[in-house]
């Protein structure tokens, strides 16, 4: 197992450097002068223009810019925002709990209902429920997030008034941000009703963000269950007279979860990409909205290093999933 982990760690280093190079190149491939883009329509004095280029290090050769960039990363220096003058790392840590809370709620929604729908669809193969799950999952996977979010807002927030339209908490509550996780902070506070209000604010964004992962998990679970149910050990378990529930949940589902676990890891990238739109639609103060606001303000350091941090997070999560996959499937550990 240690050699398996070492091999996976060995792949992290070139992957990370590839991400830094890609991030560095993409920012510099944007058309136009970065300083003029950041200044917008304001006229820029040549001296101020030169000072801005020097401050950003953009007056150096590209290779030197990249070496400086990697050197600053090695020192933990991600620069500071051009608009707030706060450190990029500080802003990321401040806003990350909001995105993590939303992502965990979305994965809880997707995992619970996706696994349940996939298992039942496999057990009732060819039934109306099975066809319904396949159709709905295909629609959920194909549905644009922004359109789905607006539909739910119109229905549950505007028409029925069941859920709030935006934000994480009603302005009536004044909660001290101890952890950054609103559900935890409201539980720790003395303000009655704040926790339920935080849950109401979380429901719609979590459903919107979790719809695509739910569709993928449901289809993958159904496919994996159908394959496992045809295995000899499942037939043997049935022949021994084991209860249907024990056959399904102990013998079949446990083995079917191995490929589903991989899908969970792959959905992290989907969640972070979807969070950009979801947080913008619901004015959710997380990493996605932070990056969108930085792009609109032409905040060069935030865009560059924010994208790098998100990409690094995806790499680390996939690394953890690889390790869990190796623990669940010994054959993977011994592959060279």
UniProtKB/Swiss-Prot annotation:
Gene3D superfamilies: MetI-like
Residues that span the membrane, as ranges: 10-30, 102-122, 145-165, 198-218, 257-277, 307-327
Membrane topology: Multi-pass membrane protein
PROSITE patterns in UniProt: ABC_TM1 (PS50928)
GO molecular function, one term: dipeptide transmembrane transporter activity
One Gene Ontology term from the biological process aspect of the record: protein transport
Keyword set includes Transport: yes
Domain of life according to the entry: Bacteria
Phenotype upon gene inactivation: Deletion of the dppBCDF operon leads to reduced ability to utilize di/tripeptides as nitrogen source.
GO cellular component entries: plasma membrane
InterPro entries according to UniProt: BPD_transp_1_N (IPR045621), MetI-like (IPR000515), MetI-like_sf (IPR035906)
Key words, A-Z: Cell inner membrane, Cell membrane, Membrane, Peptide transport, Protein transport, Transmembrane, Transmembrane helix, Transport
ABC transmembrane type-1 domain ranges (all copies): 96-325
UniProt-annotated location(s): Cell inner membrane
Known function: Part of the ABC transporter DppABCDF involved in the uptake of various di/tripeptides. Is also involved in the uptake of phaseolotoxin, a toxic tripeptide inhibiting the enzyme ornithine carbamoyltransferase. Responsible for the translocation of the substrate across the membrane.
Family: Belongs to the binding-protein-dependent transport system permease family. OppBC subfamily.
Subunit structure, interactors included: The complex is composed of two ATP-binding proteins (DppD and DppF), two transmembrane proteins (DppB and DppC) and a solute-binding protein (DppA1-A5). Five orthologous SBPs (DppA1-A5) are present in P.aeruginosa, which increases the substrate specificity of the DppBCDF transporter.
PANTHER family: DIPEPTIDE TRANSPORT SYSTEM PERMEASE PROTEIN DPPB-RELATED
Record's protein name: Di/tripeptide transport system permease protein DppB
């Amino acid at each position: 197992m240690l050699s398996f982990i070492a091999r996976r760690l060995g792949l992290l280093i070139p992957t990370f450097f590839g991400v830094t190079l890609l991030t560095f190149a993409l920012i510099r491939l944007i058309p136009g002068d970065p300083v003029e883009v950041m200044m917008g329509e304001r006229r820029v004095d040549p001296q101020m223009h030169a000072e801005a280029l020097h401050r950003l290090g953009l007056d150096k050769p590209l290779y030197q810019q990249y070496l400086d960039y990697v050197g600053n990363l090695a020192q933990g220096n991600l620069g500071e925002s051009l608009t707030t003058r706060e450190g990029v790392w500080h802003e990321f840590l401040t806003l990350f709990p909001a995105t993590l809370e939303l992502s965990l709620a979305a994965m809880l929604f997707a995992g619970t209902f996706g696994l349940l729908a996939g298992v039942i669809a496999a057990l009732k193969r060819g039934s109306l429920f099975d066809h319904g799950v396949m159709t709905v999952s295909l629609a959920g996977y194909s549905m644009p997030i922004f359109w789905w979010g607006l539909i739910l807002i119109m229905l549950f927030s505007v028409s029925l008034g069941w859920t709030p339209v935006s934000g994480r908490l009603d302005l009536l509550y004044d909660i001290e941000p101890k952890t950054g996780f609103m559900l935890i902070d409201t539980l720790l506070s003395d303000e009655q009703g704040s926790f339920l209000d935080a849950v109401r604010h979380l429901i719609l964004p979590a459903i919107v963000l979790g719809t695509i992962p739910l569709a993928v998990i449901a289809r993958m679970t159904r496919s994996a269950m159908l394959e496992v149910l045809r295995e000899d050990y499942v037939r043997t378990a049935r022949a021994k007279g084991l209860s249907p529930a024990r056959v399904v949940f102990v013998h079949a589902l446990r083995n079917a979860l191995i490929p589903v676990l991989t899908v969970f890891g792959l959905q992290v990238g989907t969640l972070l990409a979807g969070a950009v739109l979801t947080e913008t639609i619901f004015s959710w103060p997380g990493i996605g909205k932070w990056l969108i606001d930085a792009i609109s303000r032409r905040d060069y350091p935030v865009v560059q290093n924010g994208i790098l941090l998100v990409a690094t997070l995806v790499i680390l999560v996939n690394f953890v999933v690889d390790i869990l996959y190796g623990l669940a499937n010994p054959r993977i550990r011994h592959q060279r």
